[in-house]
Amino acid sequence: MIPGEYVLKKEPILCNQNKQTIKIRVLNRGDRPVQVGSHFHFFEVNQSLQFHREKAFGMRLNIPAGTAVRFEPGDAKEVEIIPFSGERKVYGLNNVTNGSVEMGKRK
């Protein structure tokens, strides 16, 4: 092994395999760009982003951890969202949920 060397598998790395996905169209109606990170509760994103919010409850972007999607002013794009895993609890963010993301249990 060489210091700093990476030894990677030849098979592709599959993220979020076998997760239920939903595609939604998002429009930035604001005058500033909005960037949303991989694990942000999509239901609670900036209010300048227009989309079917109810569909996004308990969901996050289907993108690799540590990455984000940027929505420029006036731009519309389709994104794929997936359900949170684990205990399915969300705290902080825009202080809307603060607990379980099971449907019907939000503030």
UniProtKB/Swiss-Prot annotation:
Q: How does it assemble?
A: Heterotrimer of UreA (gamma), UreB (beta) and UreC (alpha) subunits. Three heterotrimers associate to form the active enzyme.
Q: Which family does it belong to?
A: Belongs to the urease beta subunit family.
Q: Which keywords belong to this entry?
A: Cytoplasm, Hydrolase
Q: Does the keyword Cytoplasm apply?
A: yes
Compartments where found: Cytoplasm
What is the originating organism of this protein? Bacillus sp. (strain TB-90)
Q: Does the keyword Isomerase apply?
A: no
Protein known as:
Urease subunit beta
Main localization is cytoplasm
